[in-house]
């Protein structure tokens, strides 16, 4: 039998339990065709990069499949008919990864906070900082008194 990876994106307005049921239905479809699901990962409700069928978010589900080609074709047909599935993609692979996917490893990292961290929270006191020196001069600081602008030409002829 061939090895496949399948990623589904389900509508944002269905519950986690319904997504889990959808995964069970996929397993049942494949077992009817003589295949099996070796790994199932729920990546959660994630924001889509662009709207798909009027949805801005979607439930992501990854499946590692060991099944013959006719079972995978039947799965593809049923996923196209399922209104809860926004998008799906099934790819044939050489071998299945047993380790958690990159998306799950990214979810295991601790939260880093915002882009600039916690501005006013547990920030250590910096104490007396030394003078940073002259900040003008070659950096364009105060240019002093400017010379007079002199006579200005009109922008277009006839205008004064």
From Swiss-Prot:
Pfam families: Ribosomal_S6 (PF01250). One of its GO terms (molecular function) is structural constituent of ribosome. Keywords: Ribonucleoprotein, Ribosomal protein, RNA-binding, rRNA-binding. GO terms for cellular component: cytosolic small ribosomal subunit. Residues 106-160 have a biased composition (Basic and acidic residues). One of its GO terms (biological process) is translation. Residues 94-160 are annotated as: Disordered. Belongs to the bacterial ribosomal protein bS6 family. Binds together with bS18 to 16S ribosomal RNA. This is Small ribosomal subunit protein bS6.
